[in-house]
Amino acid sequence: MEIKGKKILVVGLARTGVAVARFLASRGAKVTVTDMKEESELADYLLQLEDLDLNLELGRHDKHTFLMSDLIVVSPGVPMDISPLLMAKAQRRVVISEIELAAAFIKAPMVAITGTNGKTTTTTLAGEIFKACGVETFVGGNIGNPLIELVTSGNDVAQVVVELSSFQLEGIQRFRPKVAVLLNITEDHLDRYASYQDYIDAKLRIFENQTVDDFAVLNVDDPLVAACAATVKSRVFPFSQRKELAEGIFCSKGIIVYRWQGSELRFDTAAFKLKGVHNIENIMAALASTLLSGADPIKAGRAVESFKGLRHRMEFIREVGGVAYYEDSKGTNVGSVVKSLESFDKGITLIAGGKDKGGSYAPLADLVRERVKHLILIGEAKERIEAELGNLTDTHKAATLEDAVAIAHRLAKAGEVVLFSPACSSFDMFKDYAERAERFNAAVRALAGGDCR
């Protein structure tokens, strides 16, 4: 990809925009950065660019700048359907994501992981497996480290593991991972997409440029994902918790079995620190993607056994009066909450709600009816969730997250579980899911009595 001397527009600042701008400037591009936020809101990021000779257009998007650019690189937080981008595309300007830009300069084989839920856990675990095998690995993408940072670092790694959101996949053209993983697809981000099908189509682009020399690792327990097997050009490697596979990776009676080209490997889930039905899927996907990439089976198994998981994902906080409190603030959509509820039997007090993302809460109905003893709702979405689920169990509404914890403490009995799994984003009441998690954890730790960890 030729960059020197080109007029390149970076849309959206934040961490990814900064990394892209610095890379482009280092390669001799004429860089302009545009963001709808004002200078005062972007002060921390602007400090990281003050040594560069570039143009800034803040608080607005100038359509003329879009039309005069040779290349437009869009940060993940910017919708691809804003009018300046649509106009630029209509005028045949090249519009790509940071992922597409970075991949053009990376020679190492790549494992790319997407799905509605489980991406970060699977990506992190795959990276840990490669590292346990002595493979120098870059782990990044939607997980927090922009892929372009690998290019700017100059590090010659042997392997790349990248987490991809639907937003990042919207802007690819030639991006081609050696192993592409699709974990699941459920309704999400319908506040950004015109339809559910548009969201699905964005996810499926991960396979777009693969060939028969590549692998598609597919969760065949998910009907939407399983259907991909008939359309992808790469070799399909399935994984399942529900059925035995002649070739692929599956879990039966607590044993994960990996079968490929006549060989068979077994991993006992009893030895794993990472618990939860949904995490078995994540583990199988991580094992499949790394073993297909040449990871040592024994070292891979040891890496899985020692992996404890990530914060804010079904994290045990403490026990109070015999009631176990779990924080799952990363459960920002209905599909994720389904998996979390499936990890417990009856007697759940569920705290949910936040900023509505546009999807239906109906998929939670059976689990709420069968397993949720008390439902406590917060945030902008509480009225809508109550309308869809409130008649299925004992339901309460709370003004704040702290109030919700207090209500849960009053209602839950010894031997039961309080689960905070919102099914919504956090932006109505909090900066992000991490701040929301810390507020919940602080409220739980403030409860009198119990075992605090």
Swiss-Prot record:
It comes from the Bacteria. It comes from Geotalea daltonii (strain DSM 22248 / JCM 15807 / FRC-32) (Geobacter daltonii). The gene is murD. Cell wall formation. Catalyzes the addition of glutamate to the nucleotide precursor UDP-N-acetylmuramoyl-L-alanine (UMA). It holds the Pfam family Mur_ligase_C. GO terms for cellular component: cytoplasm. This is UDP-N-acetylmuramoylalanine--D-glutamate ligase. It is found in: Cytoplasm. It catalyses: UDP-N-acetyl-alpha-D-muramoyl-L-alanine + D-glutamate + ATP = UDP-N-acetyl-alpha-D-muramoyl-L-alanyl-D-glutamate + ADP + phosphate + H(+). Keywords: ATP-binding, Cell cycle, Cell division, Cell shape, Cell wall biogenesis/degradation, Cytoplasm, Ligase, Nucleotide-binding, Peptidoglycan synthesis.
